[in-house]
Amino acid sequence: MDFDYTVTTEKSFDEAVKAVEQETKTAGFRVLYIHDVSATLKEKDFEIKPFKIIEICNAKSAHTILQADIKIGLCLPCKINVYVKDEKTYISGMKPIVLSRFFPKANLGNLPTEVDAIIRGIIDRSK
């Protein structure tokens, strides 16, 4: 099983980032922070193509997951990456369903599957 869900988009990099921001809000999640990785690396004289990490969260889901196992906080908040590779723009997110593999003793119920569907929806509607 792949740990990520990745799509290409015909949108520009900036349009894709804006779309993810909007679709995140529409899905009932919140954008916590956007890391401009390419700008951060450029400050240290390292060049990469445009790359942003968009941290997103739903407080209710996060609370439930952290109650099951506080160590799952290592995987929070959820992240959606937007990047350019080979002249194409990609939107990518980690599949929350993999959390059960990383934390097999945590009783997460259907929540990882539910959040997985929401994140896939955000990505699909953003492309």
Mark where each language-model region is:
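Short secondary-structure transition/capping segments
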Residues: 24, 75-88, 123-127
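Compact, glycine-rich, soluble single-domain proteins
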Residues: 32-81
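Intrinsically disordered, low-complexity acidic/polar segments
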Residues: 16, 63, 100-102
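Well-ordered alpha/beta subsegment
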Residues: 102-127
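Beta-strand/loop substructures that line and gate deep hydrophobic ligand-binding cavities in soluble
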Residues: 79-104
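Terminal, regulation- and interaction-focused segments at domain boundaries
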Residues: 1-31, 124
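Short Gly/charged-rich anion-binding patches and loops
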Residues: 18-19, 36, 68, 118
